[in-house]
Amino acid sequence: MNAAPTVLLQQTQTLSAAVTQPIPGSRKIFVQGSRADLQVPMREIVLTRTPTLFGGQDNPPLSVYDTSGPYTDPQAAIDLAAGLAPLRADWIAERGDTLPLEALSSSFGRGREHDARLDAVRFPSRRLPRVARSGANVTQMHYARRGIITPEMEFVAIRENQRLEAVTDAVLRKQHPGEAFGAAIQQRITPEFVREEIARGRAILPNNINHPESEPMIIGRNFLTKINANIGNSAVSSGIAEEVEKLVWSIRWGGDTVMDLSTGKHIHETRDWIIRNSPVPIGTVPIYQALEKVDGRAEELTWEIFRDTLIEQAEQGVDYFTIHAGVLLRYVPLTARRVTGIVSRGGSILAKWCLAHHKENFLYTHFEDICEIMKAYDVAFSLGDGLRPGCIADANDAAQFGELETLGELTKLAWKHDVQTMIEGPGHVPMQLIKENMDKQLRECGEAPFYTLGPLTTDIAPGYDHITSAIGAAMIGWFGTAMLCYVTPKEHLGLPNRQDVRDGIMAYKIAAHAADLAKGHPGVQVRDNALSKARFEFRWDDQFHLGLDPEKAKEFHDETLPKDAHKLAHFCSMCGPHFCSMKITQDVRDYAAEHGISEDHALEAGMQEKSGEFVAQGAQVYRAS
């Protein structure tokens, strides 16, 4: 074991309180599965009693999906230098189809391991990776197609249901019918349904055997809509400690997966620290690191360098790879008349390689070789859209859709190897063209999960692209996209800071939830109903705690009404005490109850009383004060 020197250890010894304190008004709970070591974490929002004025009943706690891992659990001991507990290690080992390696398989990984100059940044706890036994396939899709329900599948089913069976209040269970556009939305998610969806290719459960710390989650249009957050250092910004904190910050606010897009120094070591401390799946774009290995000269990339990079990252524990195998030589000329050309970093790297060699993309020609690597570690494909439109003028053009058709072809090839696969999508698309993207993806790619960046619905709002894209994200999520890649306010302008990450995640949590409401996902309206009930009953703290960002809600409220007494007030600063619509509604109800009449009759009687007062006072519209 290599002991990291003091500087990095000091930086990572303690995360800031802002990223580790419990979510206000919530506590961590664990839902027991069928075996002792299967406990599914959730966040339980503790609610206060309804005031006597409104009936005086207790409000039971509400369970919600939680991505924050142990970082918001005051009972958990966090040691970044040791990493998280290997939750899935026993599940992986007991299947008997993997074995620990005696040494790293990647030549680059071995070189880093023996380079003493890296001791200052190396993750201190060394662990040898596992790999599939000779001839074995260790993907969740392979198990699913053999009829096996794994512990990971049961974990996912429990997690997706969010203890909906505990909600018995008819007011909270009320839900509008949804429009799911042909999706097979279930009233209750069972482990068998999870297995069926993975076997069919309509969902993926990204869980590399070398990332046993991860809490199983699922991506598919028949499940809750997920969001991804991007982190990563660059040549000009941020170090390892900052990236680990950014990871924890991202999952605190709801990042279901995190992509490490690092392009600066110490990519390998940064990724080690991130994966060992991540309870959510980690994705990467391996071509970025491969390019670093040839000093940024795309034309010098080779299959051998890329293959070694895939194995290096798979043995670290990366759960899904963005692979731009659909950028074909014949599609590159189709981008020549675009307004913004090729905007994907990965797409431009592969296009440059194709043109430099006048050969077909080596990721395409070696695709089945890549599948062999993926199924030996259970890494999922995220087939990259290297020709996505970079402005709305280029949306839905021949280059974009040509690549999508090729991704459909590659999906079927990946499924032949039982490799889990999702498809990446645009980009910049005006609202009227969004559904065409979703419909074509479902048709071409056999309903494999769609994973989209937005799309941004207009190009005129630099600094606000978390909003322009959340509009498109909500729409395409409703139409069937399974995971939404967040966009921050800094998109097109610079690298996001911590506040930008939070703003981007919040915009996308809203979009994902709005999509689930529109699809009619079972129980998804419970939280809305609970918050609305709390709002009507002036339970201010409950309103804050039921929101996606309790801290921001309380901060805004307290800007104008900061005292504790204001948390009991039957008004807010918007309307004040005399014009609160909800207070007036309650006054009508009280009048009706006092006089033993219906609310409609109460309104009529109240109008008659006011009419009499008006006439008695002289029937003057304006009176001297």
UniProtKB/Swiss-Prot annotation:
GO biological process, one term: thiamine biosynthetic process
UniProt key word Calcium: no
One annotated Gene Ontology cellular component of this protein: cytosol
InterPro entries registered for this protein in UniProt: ThiC, ThiC-associated_dom, ThiC/Bza_core_dom, ThiC/BzaA/B
Tagged with keyword Iron: yes
Binding site for substrate: 230, 259, 288, 324, 344-346, 385-388, 424, 451
Disulfide bonds: none
Cofactor: [4Fe-4S] cluster
Residues annotated to bind [4Fe-4S] cluster: 572, 575, 580
GO molecular function: 4 iron, 4 sulfur cluster binding; carbon-carbon lyase activity; zinc ion binding
EC number(s) per entry: 4.1.99.17
Quaternary state and interactors: Homodimer.
Family, as annotated: Belongs to the ThiC family.
Protein name: Phosphomethylpyrimidine synthase
Organism this protein belongs to: Xanthomonas campestris pv. campestris (strain ATCC 33913 / DSM 3586 / NCPPB 528 / LMG 568 / P 25)
